């Protein structure tokens, strides 16, 4: 419902965590704007600051708490009247978080998203909403994937003007909070895997795909907003379609997304190695408009460690998968994350991981030290390693990864790349132009700086063909070969 105070209320959404959280924030922004709220960029200029928290790892939780506390300080110093925590940490800890974080005026879970406006309005009128009570969200949908589409929650939205529905397709309830040339599109939510270290399925729920028409409608809307690259995200993208009756639904979806007018690049995130199939490899390396980018979640390469993680694979199967990727597209971008110091991990396991990384030639590797996550199976495992051992192993693998990432970047010297321009800043009369090549995902995979010749003009959103001339870690320096395309 719209604000009832007679004057416009303002709200700022502060987002932490992954691209999936970015989508959630923009969907919340769309609902709040529909309800009459004014969206502002900075919390210190808003009546209400909504902090979309991340609960992935310990550092992310600390960052979320610090952000809530910083927003709460604004209540004493500025116009901000209320601070509300939402997102994964709020969903996961609920009332316990509320008790330990009284500075927040409310802790609201995912079920509050559909009527967030009413909750915020009530808070501004002095009411105290009941704090979210966590529950295992895997219990909210049928066990059988095929039965989930009929049971998935659908929030009723305000009617569209006559004539716009249903021919126009599903309504997009989203408001962009940034103006960059790329945007994430959530194609599914939840996860059915049972990795022992991961709490995400418990608070994100069972895996549910979004129907293709919803994904395409949102992609078309983003293209109308000037977006050139869409980043398809979920907790496990390779499972897309399992609840739609088609395990090859992702392969079928990709060409339709890439065909949306105005979209120049389609990127797919978070591929589960055990679920990657030949047809998907073909689609990701040969579909026009889809970049050959593989975000493969290896986590480790020692079969013994992977078994304790309840994951599949090992050094040789993973290397075979990488060979299949490069047989199809030698320049494909490949990134991964690994967990070091998992319970029961031996020095021999770390040696095997390091050997795998040396042979894998990955563009980017994120290295995480294991720490217990509340409520996970790994929390109960024996063989826990001392903190100093975990830290030493993280340091060892991180130093190796830094060398290997630089080596992989150096292999790209002389390579011709397509760079999506994301930033053009004038520095004393000379443009400083930064973007991403096809093998570089947003935010975490490095960037490419363009060394422009005199008179070469580019704008944000342009695709520039360039040749790689230098490297700095995962970052590249490249010189344009042809005029930019708009």
From Swiss-Prot:
All residue ranges annotated as the TRAM domain in the record: 410-482
Catalytic reactions of this protein = L-aspartate(89)-[ribosomal protein uS12]-hydrogen + (sulfur carrier)-SH + AH2 + 2 S-adenosyl-L-methionine = 3-methylsulfanyl-L-aspartate(89)-[ribosomal protein uS12]-hydrogen + (sulfur carrier)-H + 5'-deoxyadenosine + L-methionine + A + S-adenosyl-L-homocysteine + 2 H(+)
Q: Which UniProt keywords apply?
A: 4Fe-4S, Cytoplasm, Iron, Iron-sulfur, Metal-binding, S-adenosyl-L-methionine, Transferase
Q: Name one GO biological process term.
A: tRNA modification
Q: Which residues form the MTTase N-terminal domain?
A: 9-125
Q: What does the entry comment about cofactor binding?
A: Binds 2 [4Fe-4S] clusters. One cluster is coordinated with 3 cysteines and an exchangeable S-adenosyl-L-methionine.
Localized where? Cytoplasm
Q: Does the record carry Glycoprotein as a key word?
A: no
Q: Which Pfam families match?
A: Radical_SAM, TRAM_2, UPF0004
Check the record and name the CDD domains matching this protein. Answer: Radical_SAM
Q: Where the protein is mainly located, per its record?
A: cytoplasm
Name the InterPro entries on file.
Elp3/MiaA/NifB-like_rSAM, Methylthiotransferase, Methylthiotransferase_CS, Methylthiotransferase_N, Methylthiotransferase_N_sf, NA-bd_OB-fold, Ribosomal_uS12_MeSTrfase_RimO, rSAM
Residues recorded as binding [4Fe-4S] cluster 2, renumbered to this chain, are: 191, 195, 198
Signal peptide residues are: none
Q: Per its database record, what is this protein's job?
A: Catalyzes the methylthiolation of an aspartic acid residue of ribosomal protein uS12.
**Which family does the record claim for this protein?**
Belongs to the methylthiotransferase family. RimO subfamily.
Name this polypeptide is given: Ribosomal protein uS12 methylthiotransferase RimO
Organism of provenance: Kineococcus radiotolerans (strain ATCC BAA-149 / DSM 14245 / SRS30216)
Q: Which gene encodes it?
A: rimO
